[in-house]
Curated annotation (Swiss-Prot):
The keyword Hydrolase applies. GO terms for biological process: RNA processing. It is an enzyme of class 3 (hydrolase). Residues 10-136 form the RNase III domain. This is Putative ribonuclease 3. InterPro entries: RNase_III_dom, RNase_III_sf. It catalyses: Endonucleolytic cleavage to 5'-phosphomonoester. Pfam families: Ribonuclease_3. It comes from Frog virus 3 (isolate Goorha) (FV-3).
Length: 371
């Protein structure tokens, strides 16, 4: 564990702190021990400390990364970012992508996807708490450990492509509910979800407006809600979001391979023209550009070792399928579905890389089996 932990900390933590943190074996034994394994000596206390650090981190970080949100209109978006990226799904995905799972002591409790997610989330928060406690204890400076933990989280989130758009921050189920609330008088009813077996059907006044199949109820609901939103939009029913449409892209070059997006709230965000990855942001174009990392990041295709999304699309078209694959993103995890059924997952901080990695894994499977 010491080698893994040292490598994990090396990117974000000053050299002098690393042995202080890694050397606290008493804390790390707790970090990876849930209450179900040891009711008296587990991660619960550290988890509370880590949760407090995360609660401070998110609003502070997002206001620094997106200065345009430092306004009355931006408060709602900051709150939503905090909810979305501080969720169980987000923290568990981060912990999983960093390799936490192999160290967690699950004990006699059966592990299913839900308990696995909870264990990963709790452990990540306990990890932050352990960093705080180790540094504070060594230097007898209250709060110094929180500064170190903040830097770790900042480096994790700096590598994420974070969108401020309404459709990225709110899932389809939430957006459909909001549409129903706003347009209730026009639509004359509520969207009703009917779950039977592996199928979810959404009806509005008895009319089917969305349908999806698959093993995971939550994913089915999101896919069916997406169909419902598309259908209602085609029929002229959609919610106008002047206040929520935070980013409005103004196409145009702003340096080598970069595009500037102007916010409705007055700031600017710089994206990679091809990758779509957020490279920098600020109150002015100059400030946003000054924060762009100088080194070129590998593209999603380069990370995956090929354009597997295109290869998979060509393969499916050759067997008579079009538009049968969807990508459902939760935090740093993507679930690929084919005809509504989950077929592959991948973890990565960058959305396009996640999709290429999932496509690669599934392409290799179907190409080998010919299914």
């Amino acid at each position: 564990m010491e080698g893994w932990l040292g490598n994990l900390l090396a990117k974000s933590v000053k050299d002098k702190y690393i042995p202080v943190i890694v050397g606290r074996r008493d804390l790390w034994n707790k970090v990876f021990t849930p209450k179900s394994v040891n009711p008296d000596d587990n991660y619960e206390a550290l988890e509370i400390v880590g949760d407090g650090v995360a609660s401070y981190f998110f609003p502070s970080y997002f206001l620094k990364r997106f200065p345009q949100l430092n306004s009355p209109k931006g408060v709602k978006t900051v709150a939503r970012l905090k909810i979305y990226y501080g969720s169980k799904k987000s923290f568990s995905s981060i912990a999983d992508s960093l390799g936490f799972w192999k160290f967690i002591r699950s004990g006699p409790v059966p592990v299913n996807p839900s308990t696995r997610e909870s264990l990963l989330e709790d452990t990540f928060e306990a990890f932050l708490g352990a960093v705080c406690m180790a540094v504070d204890d060594e230097y007898s400076i209250d709060g110094l450990g929180a500064v170190v933990a903040y830097k770790i989280m900042a480096d994790i989130f700096d590598d994420m492509d974070i969108s401020l758009e309404y459709t990225a921050l709110f899932d389809t189920v939430t957006r459909l509910k909001e549409l129903m609330d706003v347009k209730k008088d026009v639509l004359g009813g509520d969207a009703v979800y009917n779950h039977r077996g592996d199928t979810t059907v959404i009806t509005l006044k008895g009319r089917v407006i969305g349908k999806a199949t698959g093993a995971i109820k939550r994913d089915r609901a999101k896919e069916a809600a997406g169909q419902a939103l598309d259908l209602l939009r085609r029929e002229g029913h959609f919610r106008e979001h002047d206040d929520d449409a935070v980013v409005k892209v103004a196409k145009g070059p702003a340096g080598d391979g970069l595009v500037v997006a102007q916010s409705a709230l007055g700031g600017f965000t710089v994206f990679g023209a091809e990758s779509g990855v957020v490279e920098g942001s600020g109150g002015t174009v100059a400030q946003a550009l000054s924060r762009v990392v100088g080194t070129k990041r590998p593209s999603a295709v380069e990370v995956a070792g090929g354009d597997y999304k295109s290869l998979l699309k060509e393969y499916l078209e050759s067997v008579g399928e079009t538009d049968s694959v969807n990508y459902i993103h939760e935090g740093v995890t993507v679930t690929m579905t084919r005809k509504g059924k989950p077929v592959a997952t991948a973890n990565h901080l960058v959305k396009k890389v996640r999709e290429q990695l999932a496509s690669r894994d599934y392409y290799r499977t179907v190409h080998a089996k010919g299914v």
